[in-house]
Curated annotation (Swiss-Prot):
Domain notes: Has three domains with a flexible linker between the domains II and III and assumes an 'L' shape. Domain III is highly mobile and contacts RuvB.
Cited function: The RuvA-RuvB-RuvC complex processes Holliday junction (HJ) DNA during genetic recombination and DNA repair, while the RuvA-RuvB complex plays an important role in the rescue of blocked DNA replication forks via replication fork reversal (RFR). RuvA specifically binds to HJ cruciform DNA, conferring on it an open structure. The RuvB hexamer acts as an ATP-dependent pump, pulling dsDNA into and through the RuvAB complex. HJ branch migration allows RuvC to scan DNA until it finds its consensus sequence, where it cleaves and resolves the cruciform DNA.
Disulfide-bonded cysteines: none
Gene3D superfamilies reported in the protein's UniProt record: 5' to 3' exonuclease, C-terminal subdomain, DNA helicase RuvA subunit, C-terminal domain, Nucleic acid-binding proteins
Assigned keywords, A-Z: Cytoplasm, DNA damage, DNA recombination, DNA repair, DNA-binding
Region annotation Domain I: where it falls in the sequence: 1-64
Compartments where located: Cytoplasm
Protein source organism: Burkholderia cenocepacia (strain ATCC BAA-245 / DSM 16553 / LMG 16656 / NCTC 13227 / J2315 / CF5610) (Burkholderia cepacia (strain J2315))
Assembly, per entry: Homotetramer. Forms an RuvA(8)-RuvB(12)-Holliday junction (HJ) complex. HJ DNA is sandwiched between 2 RuvA tetramers; dsDNA enters through RuvA and exits via RuvB. An RuvB hexamer assembles on each DNA strand where it exits the tetramer. Each RuvB hexamer is contacted by two RuvA subunits (via domain III) on 2 adjacent RuvB subunits; this complex drives branch migration. In the full resolvosome a probable DNA-RuvA(4)-RuvB(12)-RuvC(2) complex forms which resolves the HJ.
Biological process, per Gene Ontology: DNA recombination; DNA repair
Region called Domain III, residue ranges: 144-193
Record protein name field: Holliday junction branch migration complex subunit RuvA
Annotated stretches, region: Flexible linker: 139-143
Length: 193
């Protein structure tokens, strides 16, 4: 398997790249999140790769971060999700946004991606739950919106609301809202329901 490629970036045509490694040009498909962060053509690039071998092709998919490649691999494990759809998911949202959608069980957010219908979105949510690095450590940071969402949900559960009710209420809380204000807004949303 080819796990990493370092070389000179010769061509960039979304989502395809051509990378020269000691005279050999590798065609690599990348998600748009990686594409937008690439250096200019003619400069050195290092990509983590996932090689997929089919009977009619050997394909390389490239990523700038380990997090993206790991998420791509998790997506490939899901029934009905191929490499193209996994690439489309990572092109349509960042790994952090995907982890947040999984944590919040937000199927509507996933259905906005091209090629993702309601059933596929629900399958993604079900099969990715807890697999994105514990949903990226609830999005890796003590003050991240996802951590607040988790704290708000735990408070609602402690008050006797079901997880489904709590998740629905949290969708009404704007990102970046503090825990105490978030609980108030969620309770307000629940009282209207």
């Amino acid at each position: 398997m080819i796990g990493r490629i370092a070389g000179i970036l010769l061509e960039k045509n979304p989502p395809h790249l051509l990378v020269d490694c000691n005279g050999v040009g590798y065609e690599i498909d990348v998600p748009m999140s990686t594409f937008y962060n690439l250096p200019q053509t003619g400069e050195r690039v290092v990509l983590l790769t996932q090689q997929i071998v089919r009977e009619d092709a050997h394909l390389l998919y490239g990523f700038l971060t380990q997090q993206e490649r790991t998420t791509f691999r998790e997506l490939l494990k899901i029934t009905g999700i191929g490499a193209r759809m996994a690439l489309a998911v990572l092109s349509g949202m960042s790994v952090q946004e995907l982890a947040q959608a999984v944590t919040m069980q937000d199927a509507a957010r996933l259905t906005r991606l091209p090629g993702i219908g309601k059933k596929t979105a629900e399958r993604l949510l079900l099969e990715l739950k807890g697999k994105l690095g514990a949903d990226l450590g609830a999005l890796a940071g003590a003050a991240s919106p996802s951590d607040h969402a988790t704290d708000i949900l735990n408070a609602l559960l402690a008050l006797g609301y079901s997880e489904k009710e709590g998740l629905a209420a949290i969708k009404n809380v704007p990102a970046g809202t503090g825990v105490s204000e978030g609980i108030k807004l969620a309770l307000k949303a629940l009282s209207k329901a």
